[in-house]
C-alpha cells in the first residue's frame, strides 16, 4: 500500500493510537602489522628492529582504535542478537591482538529503550554527550558486516577527523522512485546514500553538529521508509551539510572473493540458512484479494509462485470456485484492509492445523519465493513471537512505532498470532491500514518487529542495483509497469545455481 505522509488517515491513526493499548561462527581473516625498516644490515638485525618498530606501530594503532566507537545495527530477536554478539566478539578479539586499549562496541537494540533507536538519528545527542570529547569516529555496521580492523584504521586515517565527514559505499537511484518520494526526479543519480551492509562512518564533529541541530529542531513525526536514504538527506540538509564521500574500501563483496583483498569491510550473508529449510507443510500462505482482481492478479500467482506453497488460501469478498477463493464475509475496501487481515489471523488460529507454525500474509500483487522463505525461516524459532518482513516506521522521532509493510509480505509465528489475538488490540475501522495497526499492536505488547532486507515493498527497479547485488531476495511487490511473470522468473524463481550454503549465485538478470 502506498504511503503519503500527511494524509488524514495517518493523522487519525496517530490520534487514535492510545485507544488500542488498553486493549557462523565468524570468519576472522588473519592480519599482521609488518614493518620493513630501513637500515637493517643483515638478517640478525632484522628481528630486533622489526620488534621495536612493530611495537610502536601497534601502540599507535591501539590509540587510534580507542577513538572509534563501533555501533552494530542489531535487533533483539534471538537469531539476530546472537549474530551481533558474534561480530562484537570478533571486533574485540582483533583489537586485543593490537594492544590493551579496546574500542567501544555497542549493539543498537541494547542502547535505548524507545522504539526508534534503530533509526539512528534519535541517538545522536547521546553519542555527542558520551563520545563527543574523547572519540574521532562513530562507525556503523550491520550484523553481517565483516571488519578488518587494521584496514579500517588505515582507511579512516586518510581523513582529517577534525572535520565533518560522512563516509560509506555510495548507492544511488537510476530513476526516481516511490520509496524515496520521487526525490531528485530530474537527476536521481546526483544524490548518493550509504549501503549499510558495507559499514558507514560519521566523524565526531559531524555527530556534534547533528546533535546540536536535533536539540533545536526535534525530528518531525513522519514515516521511516528507507532509513539509509533518509539519513543521507538529513545530513545533507539541502546542501548545507556534507554529501556522502564514497570509500572504496567499504565493500559488500564476499569475504572470500578475490575482489575483497583491498577491502576494510566485506559482507558475509546473502541468504541465511540455519540447518534444513522448514518444511513446505509448516508454512501457511494467505493471499488477500478481491473480486475485481481475480482475472488479472490471481493468474500471475498461479503462473509463478503458487506451486511452491503446500498450504495456500485466497481470501476475497467473493467466493469463486474456479480459483478457489474464500469469502470471509468482510466487504472489500479501497484501502487499509484491516478487517480482512484480522479475519485471516482468526482463521489461521482456529481453522488451520495447530501444528503449522508459520503464517505468511501477502497481497495478490506480491511476488514471493516460498522456497527462499523456507530457508530464511530455518533461522527463526517458531516458539518465539516472531513478526518478520520489511520494517518501516511511523513517528519514531516522537515515540511512534515500527511496522512490517504489507506489500512485501508479513510473516507471523503462531505464538505471535496467539498473543496478538489474546490482547484487546483491534482495528479502529475496517479500512484502517492493516500493517500499521499490526505494528502498533505488537509494539504495545512488547513484541519487536524483526526486519529482513530481503523483503521488498516495491519493484526491483525501485532499488539501487548495488543494493540488490548482495541479496538473494525473498519478495517484491506491485505489477505496475512491469511484466510480473518475467520479474518473478528473473529475480525470485528457484535457481539451480543457488548454492546450498546461501552464498550469492551468478544470476543473469536483465534490466527490468
Question: At which residue positions do the language-model features occur?
Answer:
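Secretory-pathway lumenal glyco-enzymes, predominantly type II signal-anchor Golgi glycosyltransferases
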Residues: 2-512
